[in-house]
Regions:
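Hydrophobic alpha-helical bundle signature of multipass membrane enzymes
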Residues: 4-124, 130-166
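Gram-negative (and chloroplast) outer-membrane scaffold detector with strong preference
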Residues: 80-85, 89-92, 111-115, 238-326, ...
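Transmembrane beta-strand segments of Gram-negative outer membrane beta-barrel proteins
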Residues: 22-39, 208-226
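Outer-envelope beta-barrel architecture signal
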Residues: 150, 207-217, 231, 247-253, ...
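Sec-dependent signal peptide cleavage junction
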Residues: 1-21, 199-214, 358-359
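Outer-membrane beta-barrel "beta-signal"
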Residues: 211-213, 217, 235-237, 343-359
Length: 359
C-alpha cells in the first residue's frame, strides 16, 4: 500500500483548475500557415535586411545550441528530477518524437528540394536545426514546464536563438525556419500521443491548463510593412506582469524597448521605449485572444533628439501555447518634422513568452 502511494506521488503532478487552456496540437498550425503563405513572400525581404546589416556574419554556435533543450530533457531524470509522468513514459515519448522528427524532416527536405540562400544545396526546406531545437523545447516544456517554468523558457529561448542563427548565417529562408519549428513541435506532441497508446493511459491532454499569473518577458519578432511599400524587421522586448482577471481572461502592464531594421539603404535603424498594456480573452477555454497596446517615444540613428517621434500601436494576438503567441499589429508614428513620410504600418510575426515567475 505504501509503495503504491509513493509511485502515484512520483508519477503525477497536481493540476490546478484556475488556469486558462492551451491547445497543444493546434499550437503549431499558425507556424505552418505562415510558412506556406505569408513567409515565402517575405523571404527575400528578410534576406535583404540580413545582407544589409550582417553581410559577413558567420557563426557555428547554432550547430551545438540546437541540441541543448533535447539534451537537458533527456538528462534531467538521471539527475534525480522526475519528469511529469515518470521516467519510462518520458523516454518512450522522447523516442517516438525523435523518430517522427527525423523521418518527417529528412523526407520533406529531399521531397521538396528547395535551394538554400547560399545556393550550395537543395535541402533547405524545412530547417533541420530549427526542428531539432523546437522538438527539444516542446519535449522539455511537456515534461517539466508545469512545475519549472524557467526550464520551459530556457528551451524556447535556445530554440529561438537557433532559428535566428540559421537566418543570420544565410543557411535558411525565413519560411524554412517557421516550418522547422512547426515540425519539431508537432513531432513532440505526436510522440506523447503515441506513448499514451503504448502505455494505455490518457496522460497527454490536447487541451491543457496553463498559468496566466506570471512575470513574462515577451520578445516579439516580425516583418513590418508601411502603406507606402517599405519593409522592415521589427524586434521588441517587453517585461509584463500578466495576471488573471477572472474567469474570462487576463490583463497586464509593463514596459518595452524596440528596434527596427529597414530594408531600404537610405533608412536608418530606429528604436523606441514604450509603456505597454495587455488584455486577453479566454475563448471558450480553448485558446486566448488578446490585445497589446503601447505608447512611447523613440528616435532614429545617431540623432534621436532631432528626429524624435511619438507613436503607438494596437496588437491582436492568438495564443494557443504558453510559451509563444502569433500577433497582428497596426500602428502609427508621429514626428515633429511634418515632411517625414510616416504612414500607418502593419506587422505580423511571432512573440516568444518567457515566464520568469508563475503562480
Amino acid at each position: 500500500m505504501r509503495a503504491d502511494t509513493v509511485s502515484v506521488r512520483a508519477d503525477t503532478v497536481p493540476v490546478r483548475t484556475d488556469r486558462l487552456m492551451e491547445v497543444r496540437p493546434l499550437a503549431a498550425m499558425p507556424l505552418l500557415i505562415l510558412a506556406a503563405t505569408a513567409a515565402p513572400q517575405a523571404d527575400w525581404h528578410i534576406r535583404n535586411i540580413r545582407n544589409r546589416y550582417f553581410p559577413y556574419l558567420r557563426m557555428h554556435w547554432d550547430d551545438y545550441v540546437q541540441f541543448a533543450p533535447l539534451a537537458l530533457s533527456l538528462s534531467l531524470p538521471a539527475c534525480g528530477i522526475t519528469p511529469r509522468w515518470g521516467n519510462a513514459y518520458h523516454y518512450t515519448a522522447h523516442s517516438f518524437a525523435v523518430g517522427i522528427a527525423l523521418l518527417g524532416v529528412l523526407g520533406t527536405k529531399y521531397a521538396v528540394g528547395r535551394q538554400r540562400p547560399q545556393g550550395n544545396s537543395h535541402n533547405s526546406f524545412p530547417s533541420g536545426h530549427t526542428a531539432t531545437a523546437f522538438l527539444g523545447a516542446e519535449l522539455l516544456d511537456l515534461a517539466y514546464g508545469e512545475r519549472y517554468p524557467l526550464l520551459a523558457s530556457f528551451g524556447y529561448l535556445t530554440a529561438s536563438l537557433t532559428a535566428y542563427g540559421r537566418i543570420l548565417n544565410n543557411r535558411h529562408w525565413g519560411s524554412d525556419v517557421l516550418a522547422g519549428a512547426a515540425a519539431g513541435i508537432l513531432s513532440a506532441d505526436a510522440g506523447y500521443w503515441l506513448a499514451d497508446l503504448v502505455w494505455r493511459q490518457k496522460r497527454f491532454a490536447a487541451f491543457e491548463r496553463t498559468e496566466m499569473s506570471a512575470i513574462v518577458v515577451d520578445c516579439s519578432q516580425g516583418m513590418e510593412r508601411t502603406f507606402c511599400g517599405s519593409q522592415a524587421w521589427s524586434s521588441e522586448v517587453a517585461v509584463l506582469k500578466v495576471t488573471r482577471g477572472g474567469e474570462g481572461g487576463t490583463f497586464g502592464w509593463g514596459g518595452s524597448i524596440g528596434t527596427k531594421l529597414s530594408e531600404r539603404s537610405e533608412t536608418k535603424p530606429s528604436y523606441s521605449i514604450n509603456i505597454v498594456g495587455e488584455g486577453g480573452l479566454d475563448m471558450g477555454k480553448r485558446m486566448n485572444c488578446g490585445t497589446l497596446m503601447s505608447i512611447g517615444i523613440g528616435g532614429i540613428g545617431a540623432t534621436p533628439l532631432a528626429e524624435a517621434r511619438l507613436g503607438g500601436y494596437v496588437s491582436f494576438d492568438l495564443s494557443a501555447h504558453r510559451s509563444w503567441r502569433l500577433f497582428f499589429l497596426i500602428g502609427r508614428q508621429l514626428q515633429a518634422n511634418r515632411d517625414a513620410d510616416l504612414p500607418l504600418f502593419i506587422q505580423t510575426g511571432i512573440a516568444l513568452r518567457l515566464r520568469a515567475f508563475a503562480w
